[in-house]
């Protein structure tokens, strides 16, 4: 399953929508996706979204789409 992670790079700053960044990771479940992010980054995670097949197809149309691996 592909998950879209919305995060802030600097955990000490207040989250602002204008500075929210996203990445995509592959995981078997939402808890595993959160665990992967927490173990490999210092990011302030705002939201983790499980993407449907249609959503993945839509996101792949973006030239910047890339599934991050750690």
From Swiss-Prot:
Gene3D superfamilies in the record: RNAP, epsilon subunit-like
Pfam families according to UniProt: RpoY (PF07288)
Superkingdom in the source lineage: Bacteria
Catalytic reaction list: RNA(n) + a ribonucleoside 5'-triphosphate = RNA(n+1) + diphosphate
Gene Ontology biological process terms, A to Z: DNA-templated transcription
Coiled-coil ranges from the UniProt annotation: none
GO CC aspect terms: DNA-directed RNA polymerase complex
EC nos: 2.7.7.6
UniProtKB keywords: DNA-directed RNA polymerase, Nucleotidyltransferase, Transcription, Transferase
InterPro entries: RpoY
GO MF term list: DNA binding; DNA-directed RNA polymerase activity
Keyword match ATP-binding: no
Protein family membership: Belongs to the RNA polymerase subunit epsilon family.
Function (record text): A non-essential component of RNA polymerase (RNAP).
Subunit note: RNAP is composed of a core of 2 alpha, a beta and a beta' subunit. The core is associated with a delta subunit, and at least one of epsilon or omega. When a sigma factor is associated with the core the holoenzyme is formed, which can initiate transcription.
Designated name of the protein: DNA-directed RNA polymerase subunit epsilon
Organism: Leuconostoc mesenteroides subsp. mesenteroides (strain ATCC 8293 / DSM 20343 / BCRC 11652 / CCM 1803 / JCM 6124 / NCDO 523 / NBRC 100496 / NCIMB 8023 / NCTC 12954 / NRRL B-1118 / 37Y)
